[in-house]
Each structure stands twice: as C-alpha cells, then as structure tokens.
UniProtKB/Swiss-Prot annotation:
One of its GO terms (cellular component) is cytosolic small ribosomal subunit. Disulfide bonds: none annotated. One of its GO terms (molecular function) is structural constituent of ribosome. Transmembrane segments: none annotated. Keywords: Ribonucleoprotein, Ribosomal protein. GO terms for biological process: translation. Belongs to the universal ribosomal protein uS9 family. InterPro entries: Ribosomal_Su5_D2-typ_SF, Ribosomal_uS9, Ribosomal_uS9_bac/plastid, Ribosomal_uS9_CS, Ribsml_uS5_D2-typ_fold_subgr. This is Small ribosomal subunit protein uS9. The keyword Ribosomal protein applies.
C-alpha cells in the first residue's frame, strides 16, 4: 500500500468494513455508492461521520469503504470502527480523543442464540400453574 493511503478494518455485530482513507475533499463512498444513497437513515450517516467530526478531518480525506454482512446499524458501526482505526494509522496522536469518545473499542455485543424450549433467546412460554 502507498503512503498516501491509510487502511482500517472495522467490525460490529456480523458486519465487516474495509476502510481506505485518501487525501481529498470529504467524499465518502460505500460499496461504490455515496453515503447518502447507501444509508437512508440520518442516524446511520451521523454514526459514520462521528470520528471525522471529532478529529476535525471531515474535508481532509476521501473515504472508500467496502462493507458486508449485518444490517444498517451494524454496518454503520463497522464503518465508524474502520474509520477510527484508519485515522489512528494516519496520526497516532488522535488515539486519545477517539478513545475518550469510545470509538476505538470494538463493541463486542453479539446476538444471543435461541435456546431449545424457549421462544427466543430468553423469552419463555407462558407458565400455567394449573
């Protein structure tokens, strides 16, 4: 990889994002679609932009992302995690601010499996005393 590009892998739930930061004007491209086209929900777009706004690098980089697996929320979280890692590769002094905001830590929460005899992971059938 060239020195003009920084890479970060982000994961959240079952989603995985590969993020490339290149010097540019602030374009964010996800699976060859713009951020606004890829994410219909404003909250998901906001989550993706959080590390850039925190480090004040919104219009400093063009970001190219390939993301797979999971749903909207998981993919947005994975992209945020990937951008955070790529920013730390670009400039290690940003780590402290990103850590305090909670973006560096991989959110380890996963879906709990369904158990035999239960309706869902924890929901039980109605109990009848008689």
């Amino acid at each position: 990889m060239s020195a003009t590009q920084n890479y970060g892998t982000g994961r959240r739930k079952t989603a995985t994002a590969r993020v490339f930061l290149r010097p540019g004007t602030g374009n964010i491209s996800i699976n060859n679609r713009s951020l606004d086209v890829f994410f219909g929900r404003e909250t998901a777009r906001m989550v993706v932009r959080q590390p850039l706004e925190l480090t004040e690098t919104v219009e400093k980089f063009d970001i190219y992302v390939t993301v797979s697996g999971g749903g909207v929320s998981g993919q947005a979280g994975a992209i945020r995690h990937g951008i955070t890692r790529a920013l730390m590769e670009y400039d290690e002094t940003l780590r402290g601010a990103l850590r305090r905001a909670g973006y560096v830590t991989r959110d380890a929460r996963e879906v709990e499996r369904k158990k035999v005899g239960l309706r869902k992971a924890r929901k039980r059938p109605q109990y009848s005393k008689r």
